[in-house]
Structure formats: C-alpha cells, structure tokens
Amino acid sequence: MAAPSSLASSSHLSRRATAAASPSIPPPSPPPPPQRLRCGWVGRAAPPTRRAPGVCSVVSPSKPGVAAVDVPAATIPDAAATGVGVAERISVSSLLEVVADDLLKLNNNLKSLVGAENPVLVSAAEQIFGAGGKRLRPALVFLVSRATAELAGLLELTTEHQRLAEIIEMIHTASLIHDDVIDDSGMRRGKETIHQLYGTRVAVLAGDFMFAQSSWFLANLENIEVIKLISQVIKDFASGEIKQASTLFDCDITLDDYLLKSYYKTASLIAASTRSAAIFSGVSTAICEQMYEYGRNLGLSFQVVDDILDFTQSAEQLGKPAGSDLAKGNLTAPVIFALQDEPQLREIIDSEFSETNSLATAIELVHRSGGIKRAHELAREKGEIAIQSLQCLPRSEFRSTLENMVKYNLERID
C-alpha cells in the first residue's frame, strides 16, 4: 500500500464531495435472510461453505490520504437516512452488542498472546489491556467480517478473522505505549502510563515486543496481501510521528498536511484492518476496496473529533490536560482553521506560549474563530463518505452497527 502523496484541500468542505466521473453505488439485490453468526470458529481443515458472492458497482480508491472516493452530493445520506444528527444517543455497550461474544473471546486471548516469558512485559500488558479501552478497532474487524461473511455466504467466521482482531489490538496497544513515551504523557484512560510505572526503557521495549509479537502472528496468517497491508501500518505509525515532530509550532501547516499525518497515525490501521477482514471473508476486490474506504474515512473522522475534544472537554473527561496538543505545538484541525481568521493566534503560537496565560488566550481564539465548528463539519463529511462506502453490503445488523459507529463518533462532540 503506497503512502498517500496528496490530500483534498480545505475547499473540499464547501462542495460536500462533488462527483467525479464515477457512478453512484447502486443498492445490492436483496440477500437471502441472514443467519445470526456467533463464535463458531473453523480452521484450515474445515473450509467455509459459500453461496455465490454478491456484486456491487464501486469507485476504486486512488490515494489513501483523504478523499479517494468522490461521492456525488445527491448520494450522500442525510441525517434521517444515516442516523447522524438524530437525538437518541448511542452507548458503547449497545453499539458493540452484536459482536459482544467475539470481543469477550478476544479479551480472554489477549494477555496469553503476549506470552509469560518476561514478568515485566506481562505486567505491562495487564496494565494496558486492562485500562478500560473500548476495543473499537477489533470490534470493527468483527463487524466487517460478519457483514461481508453474510454477503459472501460464509456460514461461520474463521480463525483468521479472530486472529486478525487480536493482532490489530496488539498493534494499537504497542502504538499507544510508544505515543505516551514520545508525548511524555502521564495518564492513559485515567491510569498511569507504562513509562510512568516502569520507566522509559521498559516502555519502549514493551512496545517493541508487542509490535514484534503481532508481526509473528501476522506472518502465521499466511496471506501475503494482509501481511503487506498491516506491515505498512507499522511503517505509517513512524511516518506519522516524524511528520508531527517536524511540524510542531508550524503555523504554515496545511489541512492536507494534517490529514496526511492523521491518516498515518490513526486511519491507516483502521483502513487496513477493515479491508483485511473483508479479504478473509473472500469477497470481491471491489468490496474489499470499499471496506478500506470505510475504515479510512471513519479513522479520519475519529481523529478530527479527538482533536476537537482537546478544546471542548475537561481534563477529567479527557484523562489528560485540556489543550495539551496545542500546548506541545501539535496544530490540529480546529487550530488550522482558526489560523485563517485570527492573526493574533499565529503570533502566540510562534512565541511557543512564552508569555503568561498565552495558552488560554490561544484556546479562546480557537473557540471564537469558528475553528471548532469547521472541524466538526470536516468530521461529519468524512463520516458521511464512510457510510456511503457501506452501500455495497446487504442490510443487516452488522452494517447498521457500522453506520452507527459514525453516529457514535460524531455524538462525542455534542
């Protein structure tokens, strides 16, 4: 998977993803009544039973950075159709109920996958795996696996689907450990970080170990396409950190730069995992590409929302100091939009907050400028494109939950 080289500019917000020459995605033919799939794992010795795979017309992705799928404005679902903007809020527990059994099995397996050779690593794994994470990334693997399994006529999920979800969570966990070291973060999900408890050396080694262990399990999946996809993600993590470090306090950073960094650090893993889940279901390449587009745009939307929350939530809600990204010089979407209208904000950031209360003034300018509102529009736009990518799937509780994942993300701002 080649790293993206260019992204849609901020003017993309004003035109709501206008159409390229590509056709809109037609709805699939009504599928046979789906069977409720639960944890009946089958191995290589028991090949899955299939019906004839479904077919849908799709737009192939071009570059993974921003808008590889140009969707005609008329085909983007409105709030009534998608649930985005509807008053009823979604809880995490209700959102993930349809894959609760899958996640329970995953939770039971995670600690054993780390191994018991080193007590310090085991203790670090227990700390991070038990820190109250939502397991959204493996949940997305299970949701796409089950949605595409219904489309392909796969009667049961495979051990590859299960192991993929475990690998994705291990990679995500390793990246969090390293992120906390790089950012010198003292808290993660309301608990002390690994490097605070065990020191930087152990934290770095623990993250390295999890990357290595996940790579070993990945190789044992024996699917070269998936191995390439997930291996690229680990490279993207490093690229994202380097890009972020090279643009600290840089008021000339563009929205394209920000979205590329966000792809590397967040969306790459989600996009690769949703595409890999579809690959293991055995659906067509076109559908696998749409699952990639879903994951990529959902990942970008999630990152933009996270960056908005850094300005709108308290330290208690965030589990870290509010405005911490800005304080460290990491300029995110709300700041990039605000810089277009607030010259004083540039002066304050250029000074690296050297004067008393300058950070508080900068945060106030971001709020006053409308930067948060424009960032919200960006997050919503990416979410709508993600939902559009699901139209080649048959209607099911799993597709509905994938759509509701977009709604849940946007509700975090309200």
From Swiss-Prot:
BP-aspect Gene Ontology terms: isoprenoid biosynthetic process; plastoquinone biosynthetic process
SUPFAM superfamilies (UniProt xref): Terpenoid synthases
Alphabetized UniProt keyword annotations: Chloroplast, Isoprene biosynthesis, Magnesium, Metal-binding, Plastid, Transferase, Transit peptide
Positions bound to isopentenyl diphosphate: K134, R137, H172, R189
EC number of this enzyme: 2.5.1.84
Any GO MF annotation of the entry: prenyltransferase activity
Transit peptide, from-to: 1-72
Annotated InterPro entries: Isoprenoid_synthase_dom_sf, Polyprenyl_synt, Polyprenyl_synt_CS
Compartment annotation: Plastid, Chloroplast
GO cellular component: chloroplast
CDD domains recorded: Trans_IPPS_HT
UniProt remark on cofactor binding: Binds 2 Mg(2+) ions per subunit.
Binding site for Mg(2+) 1: D179, D183
Binding site for Mg(2+) 2: D179, D183
NCBIfam families: prenyl_cyano (TIGR02749)
Subunit text: Homodimer.
Name of the protein in question: Probable solanesyl-diphosphate synthase 3, chloroplastic
The organism of origin for this protein: Oryza sativa subsp. japonica
